[in-house]
Amino acid sequence: MSAIGTSTPRLDGPAKVTGTAQYAFEHTGPGEPVFLHPVTSTIARGSVTSMDTSEAESQPGVLAVLTPWNAPRLADTSEREYVICQDTDVLYRGQPIGLVLAETAEAARWAQSLVRVEYDQQPHDVGFRTDHPDVYEPEVVNGGYEPASSTGEMGPSLARAQTHGHVVDQSYSTPEEHNNPMEPHAVSAHWDPDGPLLTMYDSTQSPHGVASTLAPVLGLETEQIRVIAPHVGGGFGSKGAPHAHDVLVALGAMHLPGRLIKYAVTRQQMFVFVGYRPRTVSRIRLASDADGRLTAIGHEAWSQSSRVKEFVEQAAVPSRSMYAAPNRRTFHHAVPLDVPAPYWMRAPGEAPGAFAAEVAMDELAEACGLDPIELRVSNDPETDPESGRPWSSRRLVDCLREGADRFGWSERPATPASRRDGRWMVGYGVASAAYPHMVQSGSQATIRAEGGGRYRVQVGAVDIGTGTWTALTLVAADALGVPAEAISLEIGDTALPYATVAGGSSGISSWGSAIFAAAGRFRTRYGDDPPAGAETTAAAGDNPELERYRAISFGAHFAEVRVDADTGEIRVPRMLGVFSIGRVVNPRTVRSQFIGGMTFGLSMALHEQSVRDTRFGHVVTQNLADYHVPTHADATDIDAVWLDEVDEFATPMGTRGAGEIGNVGSAAAVVNAIHNATGARIRDLPVHADALLEHLPVDQ
């Protein structure tokens, strides 16, 4: 019986629920620990002219206060995000400009408040707008994509559709959103005085990525940094690379070699140090003939970026391959501001881009007088519109049809604002979802026979709470042809074979391919009865067959929305997602992934918004009381199913990525359902009751 496809409880579950799983801040090291707290800027732009640390240094338990004038020097300061305590420049409010090392966390936090800082303050700019004077076209956008694409002629198609078809030309916006994983970013690190060797217990999605990124910054070889991350309490992309807090801890460890330096980023600092989803605006232009067949697709996107480091969401990229049209144009703009650097947040680019594109498709369906599902089906491409390659598998239409049957789509009100259930206005919405399949190159795995039919499998992957530990055990079992109980898996350590980041929905595909490669080499060399100690290491090989195809995971989201006709209160009693992701490794955890992603989409539609004070430059919603995310009462009935399939071209396991597609398109399904319930067409997220008040019925 195959282990892959078997619904399996999390192997790390008992350790987590009994409190024995150690997270980054809980690790111990040589001697008594030292606690770090940063000193941060209170201006958004300018320079530090002086720092009086005398009162802070005199506090009980304080061991040191580091500033730009006495901190250890970094070897490479070319990456501005990592230039911590090296100069006096201030590029955003909340930037680390110093740090306190103390015997307790409380002493460190108190002492940093006593550091007196003087500034030369300069005017700052944190106001995002599409007509910003510094807007520019980036050379590349997130994911390595070209910023622009063009096929055919948009102008004539739009002009023809104005008189002989239908046109949608609207703009859609998404706000800043901040990652809030259950475990905030945290590091415990010590510098070996006999080294140099830096050991870091880091809450990261990429142990090897942390080591390779920080090594040149610190003047070390990659092998001189060991990063250990056996358990990580969520990340959503924000832990995909090191940030300022990693450099802070490294500086502290260099200053006090032999001592374990500990720092857990506070919830408030999560809104400054570790990246966020930037604001976006998407202008969508759709042209169709009278029957709704698309003749042109245009998607122009503006993304907030930072003067610290460029990061541009690839919001227009999904529109390059989603639907068929002979004339297509996509374009990206960046707006640099005096803000911290944005970074990955679950489905960067795809999430805001799909919201815009899928609401626009709903608008086109209404203009054409078509059912929104039928419009999508009629524009489903036979081959990839961008590359012309055939699909490895494209079953979006099957997802839409299956979802319609399960959800009861035939009961959808044909006319917006036409169904009532007491005081509640009821509507249904649908949206398509797509997320590119990715296998990152370079991951390696080691397999060792331990005797008695047992095997040890080692790979430097990391489980960020998604079930990787369990899934890779199932993959290894099938790769070796043994029961899952015969596998002992080791992950989360740079002492293990190299592994790529847990990001881009690529983890299982990348690491699993390495395990299959190692297992194949192991069996070829040692057969089915290997001697104890037999060992093989191999890297995931190239997949030239896949290069002939375009591989994307697809899905369809359905939502029921109820809006209070008196107050505009919005409730979402039902959501359903149907997905096509190839073979499912562990149904139990992949369903959890889907539902988590759909909850993300619900949150994006109705709740999440980071509010930045333009006067001072900082986010004021710096806690989970002011920054709203869904509660159980908001997410009452969310279900996810998937098609039974194997993608023989994508990976040796037949899998495609599953981690992020749940929150691609789900926000659009909710917003489209709001329109169906009320007649209100909302194009700016999040949707609150005040946006609906003018659309509520006058006569009750």
What would you call each of these model-derived segments?
Residues 87-89, 221-229, 255-266, 273:
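Conserved catalytic cysteine-centered active-site region
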Residues 75-79, 111-114, 180, 202, ...:
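Short acidic, glycine/serine/threonine-rich loops at helix termini
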Residues 11-15, 36, 113-120, 124, ...:
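Extended active-site and interfacial segments that coordinate phosphate-rich ligands
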Residues 6, 12-19, 144-187, 193, ...:
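Glycine-rich loop/linker segments at domain edges
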Residues 231, 235-263, 468-476:
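Thiamine diphosphate
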Residues 1-142, 245:
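Flexible, low-hydrophobicity surface segments
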Residues 68-69, 219-224, 254-262, 290, ...:
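C-terminal catalytic domains of large/alpha subunits in multi-subunit enzymes
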Residues 103, 259-303, 516-531:
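Phosphate/diphosphate-binding loops
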